[in-house]
Amino acid sequence: MKVRLSPLLFCLVLLLGLVSGCGGAAVREDGKISVVATVFPLWDWTRELLGGGAEDKLSLTLLLDNGTDLHSYQPTVDDLVKITSADLVIYVGGESDRWLEEALAENVNPDLIAVNLMDVLSDRLKTEEIIEGMRGREEEDDAYDEHIWLSLKNAEVCCAAITDALARLSPALSEALAENRTAYFARLEAVDSLYRKAVDGGARNTILFADRFPFRYLLDDYGLSYYAAFAGCEAETGASFETVAFLAEKIDELDLPAVLTTDSPVPRLAETVAANTRSSDAAVLVLDSMQSVTRADIEGGASYLGMMESNLEVLKEALR
């Protein structure tokens, strides 16, 4: 979904850029460097890299903290203020961040650092694919899959780029950042090894989603195959009878123990597909794409690695 700035917000960006450009982005009341990350995984990576000793030097803000999906997000005036007054902006890139790139293009602050992680991952990007049984998108172009964070291997590459940007902003933190990066890489690699072990020990190598499919990066990392109702960025998720029938038949054909869904509070499509299998006993499981994380979730202890570990347990069940 392409999100663009409205004419009114576009004019506001110009005004905010002129104001922030006059004073310099680093000059603010609390004297802290301002870092903004658009979505939860990016925010949590940055939090881990900063560790616990940087609160007096940097403030870290999560832009989408109310559960709004990246693809349906509409920026507010407050969001634009945060972006244009930041010292560092970390974002995914892609069509859903078109509005942000428009805002950055009009920002006259020469010191602002912007890290586009799809640029960082340019040689690892994948296009959204339309496979058998999946309803195609209305757009004709081969859009890149924006769900880059669902690969632990991508996470390492992104964290390296974020570390470099933070060190540029605050050279005094360089040593601590390097230590935190090394420690976090070890944790990422440990979970990656658990995924590999689970996939190698699984009874099958195909899973099925009765939902949008944002997990291509994750499944490709471990050589897994899939069927799904819709592509990852598909806005409309009303399935046809043909889609339901195809997915139900695939569950029967491959003897799959589960049908998966993503973050949906009411997984009606998954339940319908499961009910239309021969045995009607396929479990409905949720694999979390981390697109709807709220401030309350974070206060409750949500973390990127914790959610990847929870997803691993779901994947084990789907591959048994």
Where are these regions (language model features)?
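Bacterial N-terminal signal peptides
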Residues: 9-18
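Extracytoplasmic metal-acquisition and chelation regions
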Residues: 17, 22-320
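Bacterial N-terminal signal peptides that target proteins for export
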Residues: 1-9
